[in-house]
Amino acid sequence: MALALLGRHNKIASKSSKKDAIFFYALVLLPVIQFVIFYIIVNFNSILLSFQKYDLMSNGFTFLSGDNLFKNFSDVFNLNNRGLNLGGLVLNSVVLWLCTVAFGTIPAIVFSFYIYRKRLLYRFFKFFLFLPSVIPSILLTTVFRGYMVDFVSKIMGLTGDGLLDPMSSTAFPILLIYYIWISFGAQVLFYTNSMAQVSPSLIEAGQLDGCSETRLLTHVVLPGILSTVKTFIIVSIAGIFTNQMLLYNFYGNIYKAPDIATIGYFIYSMAAPGPSNYDNYPLMSAFGLCCSVVAIFAVFVVNRLFKRFER
């Protein structure tokens, strides 16, 4: 009888496991299909484009051959011939990333802690900091440029683009501060939710020991959200090569603001949809492939540094 009961139990368990398996596969099927189509297939096509050229006569792309097979990759290192400074693009992109990490992450953690502790006007700060993430970026750009920067420029007697003149020394710092501000929302949301996972007993123990708010943040809360901070920083490395700092919203084509351009702005501007940019697609694919290789290497290096720091 025991064997019969055991066999029946195994059949029930088998049916249950099959149902669980069917539910699991049905659940992950759509994301897997999306990953295959929009990542693997799209990127595979980008890799192929790196070894192609646009033929104006046939209005299509044809493969390069012979000595010209790697022509697009050699053109990547000759962007100066297009009136652009590759070194300047890299420098601006790295400065943008460093400032975003340094002056974006730290204030975001502080504001998140303030909201988490539910101090005075915390709801207002939560709304105010997250608002830029809800409003369309082009609307924010219009308001910022048309009603704030232009107003100050007129007061100072500046003409043209005023403080946002791409040839001036004020454009890049102003746009950098603006971008950091509108980027607060997502970080504050994630850090606040991560802080909510910290055990309340730890906070209470710290308060009983007489810890100040600063010590609660640095010794109790911050260690609990360190993995989230690390993830944000590592993921943001890819932004070095994709972040355009909303420059396209302000200036449009990259040749209107070459001195403050970033790698992301360059790629976005040169690969913007339209027949006039078809000729740029192979070069941008090769450029993106080079950036991907550097980004993968940088991610591994930073991740390894974090692991050493944790030890």
Language-model segments: which ranges?
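Short, Lys/Arg-rich, polar N-terminal cytosolic tail immediately upstream
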Residues: 1-18
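A structural signal for multi-pass alpha-helical bundles of membrane permease subunits
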Residues: 16-311
